Amino acid sequence: MRGIAQCQDYLNMKQDNLYQQIHSMKNLFFAFKKARKGKTKKYYVKRFEKCLIKQLLTLSIELKSQKYSQEPLRTFILRDPKTRKISKSTFRDRVVHHAIVRIMDPIFDKNFIYDSCANRKGKGNLFALKRFDLFKRKITNNLNSKAFCLKADIKHYFQEVNHKILLTAIERKIKDEKVMWLIKQILGGGRTRQRYAFRQSYIPVFRKYLS
């Protein structure tokens, strides 16, 4: 907690462009708070927080100098109930993910349709349920007639996303070359032998920008 309090000294930094906003101490601090939400007792969060200013300063310097690269992923098997191979990024890298999203979200969010609910502020499960109930009643004449609802899932979506199409969609809105460099670093993974795993882990960060 002491590290968090000390970080308040950096919160008044003013930045001019998108990339500077991403690697600012202010943004990285709030990204850290977002990344640790619900995980404050995890050992890796406590370890990061123990030297918080040093960790965030290091990230800021690496990002500013464009020397940042992702750390190796932790891979494990999840059964819920189907078996899936999950590749999980380190907490340090998750802070960077949240730092990017905090700056990019306001740019893209206004272009999404009203009923797009995934990973949007103020539009969680409850909002989706209320909208579903509204449409259900509308299409069934207040439950007086039959209707159909399609539930679908795209198999291996994250692994199969075309990077060229995704980057083109992002570039329509993001003109900062350094931001695009960072996004390409994340999507590329930085380590060829882990490319498939990195795709699984990092594409979800940008998936909604395809909407």
What is the predicted function of each stretch?
Residues 55, 62, 135, 139-211:
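Conserved polymerase palm-domain catalytic core
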Residues 34-47, 76-87, 113-115:
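Glycine-/proline-rich flexible loop or hinge segments
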Residues 48, 120-122, 199-203:
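Conserved, non-catalytic sequence blocks in retroelement Pol enzymes and Pol-derived host proteins
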